[in-house]
């Protein structure tokens, strides 16, 4: 019996080609597009920008439907705006209000794209054996001592960081058709089959379309407070802690200093933003919570060598695990790292495989 695959169609080239390739492989393919925009945020449409959440969602839905029409497959728009607000937007706001720096795309994958979307689709009567997306990542389930999520062949486009909070159960029925391809080859294939409109489409640049996170917050969040140095000396006034993140240098507007100042920490309880020199952001260890262990706790891979990433785009650092207990991990880097921000995701790799992820605490 032919297996049915639901492909998450975003309206972009990667998900479009994933659906095309799976159909060529003989799967019974249906398209799902999640609808997250409900107009509750006062966000301007910005021409030339693409984002996952914003007023141009209708255009992306139209593009997803165009893919489905070209392939002759059913297409369903699945409303998940309520879940998106609760699990992603409210979480994002709460983290910034607490002085932390969340990654909303990681959260969306964990809670919505590989969670609420599936449940909502099945409630609509849409049944499927597998779920596929256009993510650049690979899966290989061997045994509990080995990773099951691996970096993509195209390391420049690898998206395992975004997927690192997913469980084995969530990924057990997932397909990533592009994991063994390079992005240039995906675009070339799109052009080859006459889908130049998708090959040339601009990629999503941020989780919100306009790129300005301030639109997600209320006026009551913009509470001025003190900029202080590491000794507690007041240096000036900030515009509200939700406007700052650890490691930030631009937009501080503090003059008369011997060297550039950075955001070193944020004290939400005191409504203070602590500033200091770049050297004050150097750290050799991090502790992280909400541990997602992607191998058995007895796996020899945890003994190292490990490659630690403390944010998206971080080049990584050799590291070792100092402490590992239920829900918590402490890691030491081989060399000091810059600006490990609380709230960001720590991802540990053994070779190309993801062995663990957690939320940086301190």
Regions found by a protein language model. Name each.
Residues 1-164, 191:
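ATP-dependent adenylation/nucleotidyltransferase module used to activate substrates
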Residues 132-139, 143-144, 148-362:
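AMP-forming adenylation/ATP pyrophosphatase catalytic core
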């Amino acid at each position: 019996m032919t297996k049915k695959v639901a492909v998450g169609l975003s309206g972009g080239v990667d998900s479009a080609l994933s659906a095309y390739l799976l159909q060529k492989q003989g799967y019974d393919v249906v398209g799902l597009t999640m609808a997250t925009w409900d107009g509750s945020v006062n966000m301007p449409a910005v021409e030339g920008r693409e984002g996952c959440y914003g007023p141009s969602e209708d255009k992306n839905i139209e593009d997803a439907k165009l893919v489905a029409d070209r392939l002759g497959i059913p297409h369903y728009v699945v409303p998940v705006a309520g879940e998106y607000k609760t699990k992603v937007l409210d979480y994002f706001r709460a983290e910034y209000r607490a002085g932390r720096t969340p990654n909303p795309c990681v959260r969306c994958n964990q809670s919505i794209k590989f969670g609420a979307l599936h449940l909502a689709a099945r409630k609509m009567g849409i049944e499927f054996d597998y779920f596929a997306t256009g993510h650049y990542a690979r899966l290989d389930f061997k045994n509990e001592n080995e990773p099951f999520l691996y970096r993509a062949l195209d390391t420049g486009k690898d998206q395992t960081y975004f997927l690192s909070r997913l469980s084995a159960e969530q990924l057990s029925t997932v397909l990533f058709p592009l994991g063994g391809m390079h992005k240039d080859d995906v675009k070339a294939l799109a052009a080859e089959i006459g889908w130049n409109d998708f090959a040339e489409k601009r990629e999503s640049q941020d989780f919100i379309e306009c790129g300005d996170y301030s639109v997600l917050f209320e006026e009551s969040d913009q509470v001025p407070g003190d900029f202080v140095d590491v000794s507690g000396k007041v240096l000036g006034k900030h515009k509200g802690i939700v406007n700052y993140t650890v490691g930030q240098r631009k937009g501080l507007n503090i003059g008369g200093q011997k060297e550039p100042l950075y955001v070193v920490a944020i004290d939400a309880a005191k409504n203070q933003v602590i500033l200091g020199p770049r050297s004050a952001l150097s750290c050799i260890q991090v502790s992280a919570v909400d541990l997602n262990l992607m191998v058995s706790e007895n796996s020899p891979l945890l003994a190292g060598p490990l490659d630690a990433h403390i944010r998206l785009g971080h080049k990584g650092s050799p590291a070792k695990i100092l402490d590992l207990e239920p829900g918590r991990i402490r890691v030491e880097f081989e060399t000091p790292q810059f600006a490990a921000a609380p709230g960001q995701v720590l991802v540990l790799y053994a070779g190309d495989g993801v062995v663990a992820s957690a939320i940086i605490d301190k």
